[in-house]
Amino acid sequence: MKLLEIKIESSYDVEDALAYFATEDLKALGTEARRRSDFEQAGWLHDSTVVDMDDIPNLPDELEFIAYFDEETDPEEMVKCFKDKLAELAGYGLKTAPGEISVDYVADQDWNTVWKKYYHVINLSRHLAIVPEWEDYQPAFKDQEIIRLDPGLAFGTGNHQTTQLAMLGIERAMVKPLTVADVGTGSGILAIAAHKLGAKSVLATDISDESMTAAEENAALNGIHDIALQKTSLLADVDGKFDLIVANILAEILLDLIPQLDSHLNEDGQVIFSGIDYLQLPKIEQALAENSFQIDLKMRAGRWIGLAISRKHD
């Protein structure tokens, strides 16, 4: 069996948007990202190894985004869909150039193994490290929590700045055991992080069957079997209130989530948002204010913004 491979040369600005679009809208079997910055940082990440950039084949100027589809998928239709999406993202002021798209077919077994070469240990903080299941790792500190992860076919490996901002927000908020809702869980990484950091209970929601499966499998990989999983759109049909609501999703979807927060957040609860491009921050700020929420902390990594949010108090 072969897979249809769509490669897009673009920028860091649109990585999350392309991954979400490919997985959720186009139902890609999987996605992969090759970032120039990953190779430039290789010395810091991997025992100070010296990397000659000229020796790396087909190194992207910034980002090479790859999506995999069933062999029977119409390549021309997929190219058109991605071109339209890039045009839409450019309309938001995001950098999409060069925007070159190429098509190829690869053997199925290549997808299952080759992409893992680009995914390594991430020492997120003093208290958290993200470790792919196929790598050995000894914690940097005795009490450092390890999140074992096989991202499989779901969105969220821990590599991207938006995921890391969300995890740092969870770590900051978790000063005592909290009830947590992870909205748009993807691979389950944020739900697992909350559990590892001492959450009282965790609910993970997503609209995708693939995400539900990946989150359950990744939780089991970490010996966790009590994260509640619910297939739903955002917090629709979710019962109860939570001390902490976390969402690392696109700004346009966060705008749909904001009106749902009040009925699902405990009185003194907190909200962590990530996935916000700085150009879209004003829209989020306005929507939060209109729904009686305030921003307590802004975090930034590159052009991405993370927010710690609570109710306004007179």
Curated annotation (Swiss-Prot):
<feature type="binding site">
    <location>
        <position position="248"/>
    </location>
    <ligand>
        <name>S-adenosyl-L-methionine</name>
    </ligand>
</feature>
<feature type="binding site">
    <location>
        <position position="206"/>
    </location>
    <ligand>
        <name>S-adenosyl-L-methionine</name>
    </ligand>
</feature>
<keyword id="KW-0963">Cytoplasm</keyword>
<keyword id="KW-0808">Transferase</keyword>
<comment type="function">
    <text>Methylates ribosomal protein L11.</text>
</comment>
<dbReference type="GO" id="GO:0005737">
    <property type="term" value="C:cytoplasm"/>
</dbReference>
<dbReference type="InterPro" id="IPR050078">
    <property type="entry name" value="Ribosomal_L11_MeTrfase_PrmA"/>
</dbReference>
<keyword id="KW-0949">S-adenosyl-L-methionine</keyword>
<feature type="binding site">
    <location>
        <position position="184"/>
    </location>
    <ligand>
        <name>S-adenosyl-L-methionine</name>
    </ligand>
</feature>
<dbReference type="GO" id="GO:0016279">
    <property type="term" value="F:protein-lysine N-methyltransferase activity"/>
</dbReference>
<comment type="similarity">
    <text>Belongs to the methyltransferase superfamily. PrmA family.</text>
</comment>
<dbReference type="InterPro" id="IPR004498">
    <property type="entry name" value="Ribosomal_PrmA_MeTrfase"/>
</dbReference>
<dbReference type="InterPro" id="IPR029063">
    <property type="entry name" value="SAM-dependent_MTases_sf"/>
</dbReference>
<dbReference type="Pfam" id="PF06325">
    <property type="entry name" value="PrmA"/>
</dbReference>
<protein>
    <recommendedName>
        <fullName>Ribosomal protein L11 methyltransferase</fullName>
        <ecNumber>2.1.1.-</ecNumber>
    </recommendedName>
</protein>
<keyword id="KW-0489">Methyltransferase</keyword>
<feature type="binding site">
    <location>
        <position position="163"/>
    </location>
    <ligand>
        <name>S-adenosyl-L-methionine</name>
    </ligand>
</feature>
<dbReference type="GO" id="GO:0032259">
    <property type="term" value="P:methylation"/>
</dbReference>
